[in-house]
């Protein structure tokens, strides 16, 4: 950290300051900024006269717009009466079934670390660490061993990209944008991941949205909805990017490098258009269900500014179900 401070001071004449002084300066600066200041700033933010528009693309694309076309398009957009974005909150009952949950059957406290370990009747283990280091901030992670190592070679292309496709999936009856309107990502979010060795969830919340975070956790295990449109869009984007990348000399180098490094192992080959075309809806859906069908073999870690009497019933209800 100190080396970076000195480097920026030498290169950019940036002030060298301690974290305490930086905090003091930031607090003084922030308290002087008003809402009127921000509104005035953003009114002129997009009206600068020194704008630069840059378009890059591979040589095989011959119909890129020229300077006159770009100026015309820019002027058309600038002259439009663009209304502010309206947040439409879709009122929907996310979880329609009654959740019976699982009771806490064992509770162990580790005095040296302050960690509390809960074991639920369904087998899930939850490690809780209460901390006041960041006010009203709660972080959750859950993981289980397995990942794409559990996928057969015949479904590996779909398994490899299941995690990426799930990030675009509907959650219950909500699209991604509808979910974000209901649960603003500034305050709460949760998503799944699958890598080579494990599958899991990662998320965060404030206390106000804590129940919402656990609802999202339950739905990520039980009701992520992938359809053919998600698959088509994913493949279209990947294949388009592949066709651009292969024009670059780096592509040939990376391709040859991986072939030599991993000795032609089929799970480490550089993905091609043929590889992407093997991704299909059935395999993605089945692999997702296989990896997340049971929370009983997951470990969960929750760290943050929570109260035990508030979070434990949510753990029993949602992780327990």
What are these language model-derived features?
Residues 1-32, 50-57, 127-129, 134-223, ...:
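M16 family metallopeptidases and their MPP-like homologs
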Residues 4, 8-145, 149-152, 299-301, ...:
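Proteolytic maturation boundary segments
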Residues 219-226, 318-321:
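A common structural junction motif
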